[in-house]
Each structure stands twice: as structure tokens, then as C-alpha cells.
Amino acid sequence: MMDLKVDEEEVDSGQPVSIQAFASSSTLHGISHIFSYERLSLKRVVWALCFMGSLALLALVCTNRIQYYFLYPHVTKLDEVAATRLTFPAVTFCNLNEFRFSRVTKNDLYHAGELLALLNNRYEIPDTQTADEKQLEILQDKANFRNFKPKPFNMLEFYDRAGHDIREMLLSCFFRGEQCSPEDFKVVFTRYGKCYTFNAGQDGKPRLITMKGGTGNGLEIMLDIQQDEYLPVWGETDETSFEAGIKVQIHSQDEPPLIDQLGFGVAPGFQTFVSCQEQRLIYLPPPWGDCKATTGDSEFYDTYSITACRIDCETRYLVENCNCRMVHMPGDAPYCTPEQYKECADPALDFLVEKDNEYCVCEMPCNVTRYGKELSMVKIPSKASAKYLAKKYNKSEQYIGENILVLDIFFEALNYETIEQKKAYEVAGLLGDIGGQMGLFIGASILTVLELFDYAYEVIKHRLCRRGKCRKNHKRNNTDKGVALSMDDVKRHNPCESLRGHPAGMTYAANILPHHPARGTFEDFTC
């Protein structure tokens, strides 16, 4: 049996349109004049040069925009926001004299006399020429260490016991016109010793708020700084103070006081008015800014702040260099002894604060609340009120003038200022600039770019198919792919025999043409 087959292997006919046809229908401006069916002419050359120049300018501008984006620029937005109520800040103050003279015992003098510059290293009073006779007599009695058996000494207990007591210092206290008491102040230790914080927001007490601005709507306290309790100054040490008055810091409840570096002084004999404005600062994290976005790095404080970071860093520095910590420092390291204070802790901390700029590098938190201040003051007491105040507090007029001060802290207005860093150039701006430049120089859009990619894909696919990567075998069917016939089929449908043996009387002309109506198609094919 012999089969006749017509097999054909053909290439898928996916040929893309010509570049001229694509250019004529593309939304990309200018290329229809470059790729045309006309022969090369000056017009086409000029269009090509203009198009390439526009592409070059577009690339230049887009490169500039992309470089600017990766500079991560930012702008600062300043705004004032009115409020119906504001949280009153924490107010911390310290007497500039760390220890009360009357509270220094013989045991204190034995252990810390040299630290306080009251004794020399031989336990002797160094200079008696400038001493007050009454103080000198008391000090000589305390400095007599014959048959004295020293007892254990603890710096924390000494600071707490010998520091100024709020119950003796506070003569009057009002907040928003309502009386307050020493119980509203929380003890806090700083480098100035025993200090007090009003509105600390701790120990279960809520943070106080104010509903109005101006004097009378904040905190007003009258204090006695007790200059007669100041330690006599016969020499200079890190614990010696030449000033009289208090140091004050206004700060957020979320950060500890760093009053020795950030506080301002208030002098006796004056009423000091402090007008505040709350400022909320919002910084950007890298790469747009330098703020620290993460919190919780400190093992001593829950909320990250620059002051918390500095205290934490100073504590680690002293523990590493002196194997102890100062009274105001957090942690569980042992407190420094008076000898360690004098020989190591005070010099090391002074060096760290004033000269070392590399050990304690504290990043700015991304959200900061601070308080701008404006100070003004008036003399107190007046001549008219001096006698009244002296009688009221059972003191002399001279004592009132040398020891009494009034501190009035209030909000200037019931609003706050926001200082916010914002991204100056974001992805949306970059895309908008690039899209605008594309439209300006070449009249293109994102869809135009998709057109180009689609045409490039079709061209690449066609070229790959021409190399034999897309060939397929196909069999022709009876209608359009050809028919495979066996010899039996040919014999059964043999028209030639019928032509040779046609019935009698049926004749065909010798000159009959193929496809004549008298003959069939199949007969034409087989014969």
C-alpha cells in the first residue's frame, strides 16, 4: 500500500507591522516625520535632529530631578495652633546651696569635710580669717575629732538629709489661683543635690492643665532660699557655690531635668515672671533628617530624650572610669564615696561635659516638646511691703530682701507652636516632574512608553521565530491543508475508466477544456 501525503511545516505568521506603520500610528510626537515611506530628505533629517535633541534635553532634566530626589531635601513648616487647654509643664528648681550648714554632723564633716572645702586633708579648718564667728565656733566644735569613732557614711542619705527642705523653703504656693502645698512637689536629685519638681505627673498624680494664658493662670511660688544655711566658702571645689538663689528648669514630664546645663537662675529680692510658649518639634528620620526614630535604647528611662540620653551616657562613663555613680545618676552601681567624688567623679564629669565631644553623642528624637521662655523681673519687697512681710514671716527686713523670691510661671497665650520638618520632594513629585518633562519635550506619556515596549516585544519575538525557535508542524486538513489519498481511493473514484468506457451514445469533444461543465472537478484532477 502506498500513501500520498502532503505535509507542510510553516512558520507562525506573527510578523509585526513595519516601522513606518508603527510611527504613523504612535502617540510619540515626531517619529511619524522621521520614519515615513518617503525617501530620505532634508525634512526627515531635521526632524530626526530635533527629536534627538529633545531626547537629550529630557534625559538631562530627568537626571537632574533624580539627583535632587536622592539629596532627600526637607523644608521646615512653622505654625501656631490654638488650643482650648494645655498641659502645664513640669517645673524643677534647686537651691544653689547643696547642703544646709546646720544639718552637717560631725560624722558628715569627718567623711566629707574635704569635699565641702570645710576641712583640709589633715581634718583642720584651713582658714579662719574670712569665717563668720558664729559659724566658726560651730564648725570648730564639729571638727574636734578626739575620741571620735566614725560611723558608716552614705552620700545619698547625706544629700537627702542635709539638702534644703521644701517645707521650710516654700512660703506660699498657688496654681491657677488655688493653693498648693509641699506635697505637690516631688523630690528629685540632680547635680545640684536635692531638688523639687512641681507637676511631675508621677506617683499616680495626673498632669495639671491650664485653661487660660497670662499671670494668675499658672504657678506662683514664694521661696525662702535660707542664705544663713549656706556653707561658708573658704576654698574652691566642684561643690562650692558663689551664687545665691535657685536654678529653675521648665521641661516636659517625659524627660528628666538636666538643670545644671539647661536651667536658668532666679535671684532673691526679685519677683521673676516667666512667660512660656509650648513648642512641638517634629523632625524627620534619615535619610531626610537626623532624628532618632526608635526608642527604648536606655535601660533607665522609658522615653528617649536628649537629657535622658546624656544622663545615661554620663552614668556609663563614670561607672567605667570611677567604678561608682553620683547620687543623681540612675542604675545599681554603688554610690561614689566623698573621696571618689573629689578624686574621680567630679573631674571626670566636668571633662565629659566641657571637653569630650565624642563619647556622648545623643541624637535628636523625632518628637520633642520644649518651652520657649521670656523672663522679666521686678524688685521685691517694696519699701511699702517690707515691714509687712517681715512681720508676717517673723523675719527682719534685711532677711526678707536677701532671701525671699517670687517665681511666676504661666503660658503667654493658650496656643502652641509647631515646628515640623516635611519632605520637600517625594516620589509623587518626582514622577510628576518626569511626566511633565516627557510631555514638554517629546509629547509622551506612560502609555506611549508602553506602546514602545509592545512594539519592541513584537519585533524581538518575530526575529526569534525566524531563527527557528517558534516553528511548528501542521497537517493540512481536507479544506485548506491538503488531503492524503490511498491507491484504493483512487481506484474507487477512477474517472478515467468511465471516460474510456462511457455508455454508448455519450461522446466528448476532443477539444474539451478542463473544468468544462460537462466534466467534473474530480475528473480533471485525476485525469
Curated annotation (Swiss-Prot):
Residues with site note (Involved in channel desensitization): 80
Reactions catalysed according to its record: Na(+)(in) = Na(+)(out); Li(+)(in) = Li(+)(out); K(+)(in) = K(+)(out); Ca(2+)(in) = Ca(2+)(out)
Any Gene Ontology biological process: cellular response to pH
Cytoplasmic side: 1-49, 455-527
Disulfide bonding pattern of the chain: 94-195, 173-180, 291-366, 309-362, 313-360, 322-344, 324-336
Stretches that traverse the bilayer: 50-71, 425-454
Stretches assigned to the Extracellular side: 72-424
UniProt-annotated glycosylation sites, renumbered to this chain: 367, 394
Residues annotated as site: Involved in proton-dependent gating: 356
Activity control note: Inhibited by the diuretic drug amiloride. Inhibited by Cs(1+) ions. Inhibited by the spider venom psalmotoxin-1; this locks the channel into its desensitized conformation. Channel activity is increased by the heterodimeric snake venom neurotoxin composed of MitTx-alpha and MitTx-beta; this slows channel closure and increases the magnitude of the steady-state current that is triggered by low pH.
Subcellular location: Cell membrane; Postsynaptic cell membrane; Cell projection, Dendrite
Keyword presence, Membrane: yes
PROSITE patterns to which the protein is assigned, alphabetical: ASC (PS01206)
GO cellular component, one term: postsynaptic membrane
Membrane topology: Multi-pass membrane protein
Sequence motif GAS motif, location on chain: 443-445
A GO molecular function held by the record: identical protein binding
Matches recorded under NCBIfam families: ENaC
Function: Forms voltage-independent, pH-gated trimeric sodium channels that act as postsynaptic excitatory receptors in the nervous system, playing a crucial role in regulating synaptic plasticity, learning, and memory. Upon extracellular pH drop this channel elicits transient, fast activating, and completely desensitizing inward currents. Displays high selectivity for sodium ions but can also permit the permeation of other cations. Regulates more or less directly intracellular calcium concentration and CaMKII phosphorylation, and thereby the density of dendritic spines.
Similarity comment: family membership: Belongs to the amiloride-sensitive sodium channel (TC 1.A.6) family. ASIC1 subfamily.
Subunit and partners: Homotrimer. Heterotrimer; with other ASIC proteins producing channel with different properties.
Written domain comment of the UniProt record: The second transmembrane domain (TM2) is a discontinuous alpha-helix disrupted by the GAS motif, which forms the selectivity filter by adopting an extended, belt-like conformation aligned approximately parallel to the membrane plane. This peptide belt encircles the waist of the channel and divides TM2 into two discontinuous helical segments. The distal helical segment of TM2 interacts with the cytoplasmic portion of the first transmembrane domain (TM1) from a neighboring subunit, contributing to the structural and functional integrity of the channel.
Name the UniProt record assigns to this protein: Acid-sensing ion channel 1
